[in-house]
Amino acid sequence: GCMYVWADKVRSGDPDNFEARAAAYYWKNIFSDIPNFVRGREGEPPNNLLNSGYAILRAVVARSLVASGLLPTLGIHHHNKYNAYCLADDVMEPYRPYVDGLVLDIMESTYDYSELTKEIKMKLLAIPVLDTTIGNKKSPLMIATQQTTSSLYKCFSGEQRRMVYPEL
């Protein structure tokens, strides 16, 4: 659909604002059962599930960055002196759909997801071991993030020119 068209048209710095258009389209369609869903930290459920899931993902990515010899504070696109995880926030972007998919699964299997129950937390804590495809191989998400952060280090050091991302 239109997301693929926008993806092909994105230029450096995104002067045509394709990312924002794609995000609006994505959120409108991923939770289409929820009328007028708006993604936001303080928003209505399932924002609570997304917030928790992204916090877990961020921790996994920050750990991988440190293990690769990088500082999670020094971001590429994200810059904020009050955010100690700017680089983690940059690197985690291509992994967000894995969290989104898990949240959808939780929503389908749970009648009430307005609160983070013990059962829901247990499901969210599976994020590090979610099946991920990277380099045409299946591996746990935490291993895939290690491959991504290692490739970023190699880009910074001049050993390679492209980062390794998960396939969706």
Kindly give the residue locations of the regions a language model identified.
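Active-site helix-to-loop segments that bind/position phosphate- or nucleotide-bearing substrates
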Residues: 1-168
